Amino acid sequence: VTPRGTDAERVEAANTAFYECLERGDFEELSALWMDDEITCVHPGWPVLAGRGEVLRSYALIMAHTDYIQFFLTDVKVSVMGDTALATCTENILSGGPADEESGELGPLVGQLVVATNVFRRTPDGWRLWAHHGSPVLADADEDDEDGDSSS
């Protein structure tokens, strides 16, 4: 069954599915979204990960150490050229650390902004991820230091 919509709509749906399965912690679905060929991934602050094994291991590690994560995607832009598509977005992330052993309550929630580029390739099974690159959005120095004193 071929999904309805334009290529750009199908790529945007694949991009959304990527983040939704991360939120659910669905490793099998996440794995199915990636191509079988050589893939690459850069998480914020991580080195370049190359190859299906390294990339998928990184997501297994993230899922194992993140009790709660939610992505609010903004500034989503998709462009398609032939069998390759580029999706860029801002990941507005809300995540929670491990639960407190005594209370069982989720650790403090932390917000983070990441800009991401996801590269998709058209396959017989639909659009699949070829590369993901996420970079942290650093706070503007003017916002952090309103009095102009940069010596901390």
Please identify what each model-predicted range represents.
Residues V1-L33, T40-S152:
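A beta-strand edge to alpha-helix "cap/lid" segment located at domain peripheries
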